[in-house]
From Swiss-Prot:
Domain of life according to the entry: Bacteria
Molecular function, one GO term: structural constituent of ribosome
Name listed for the protein in its UniProt record: Large ribosomal subunit protein uL30
Pfam families from the UniProt entry: Ribosomal_L30 (PF00327)
Annotated family: Belongs to the universal ribosomal protein uL30 family.
NCBIfam families (UniProt xref): rpmD_bact
Entry GO CC: cytosolic large ribosomal subunit
């Protein structure tokens, strides 16, 4: 049994300027508020949904 939790590294590569307000709030919810900032998060369904909403602003890597 593999107990390793899958993590993903998310990097903001585009600005949220000019995008909808709820997309900016989603970035803040992911812990991203500046360009080229990266966070490592657990790969859960809620995180996947948030990432899917703003995927055009992000670079996503599996860890």
């Amino acid at each position: 049994m593999n107990n390793k939790i899958n993590n993903i590294k998310i990097t903001q590569v585009k600005s949220a300027i000019g995008h909808k307000y709820d997309q900016r709030l989603t970035l803040i919810g992911l812990g991203l508020n500046k360009m080229n900032k990266s966070v490592i998060l657990e790969n859960t369904n809620s995180i996947k949904g948030m990432v899917n909403k703003v995927k055009h602003l992000l670079k996503i890597e599996n860890m």
